[in-house]
Amino acid sequence: MREWTREERYRVLKSADEISGLYEQVQRSIYRQAYHVQPITGLSSDPNGFTLHNGTWHLCYQWCPWGAAHGLKYWYHTTSRDLMHWENEGIGLKPDCYYDNRGTHSGSAICKGDKLYFFYTGNHRDEDWTRTPYTCAAVLGEDGKLNKLEKP
């Protein structure tokens, strides 16, 4: 196998169109699961934020959309009412701010009142590639989307 370059591993996903061909190829795979949570493309790793909130189970996982290589991590969001049938809700958290410019890494979730909060490790790297981790937070909106809180 060939080694992925840093540029390949940390490529930013700008639109769903960029992975549409890869998505179609993955959907046709004879190895595609019919029961378990799995990524729409690429690599999934650490499950995060596994929580029951208002009758719906929420499960996010770290996701690298391009292939089986660790790099720029997103959180992909899935939901279920029965833990058997899962719905893909799309990207939950994108690495798109100063605090997580090189990935949205492991975290958790907690229900407080009627709100569901998600906490994750923002992976920041500077121009010298020095890593600084930040504890970041998001809240589940009424539209079912995760909304980042402004500052860690």
Predicted segments with their positions:
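Beta-rich carbohydrate-recognition and catalytic domains
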Residues: 1-152
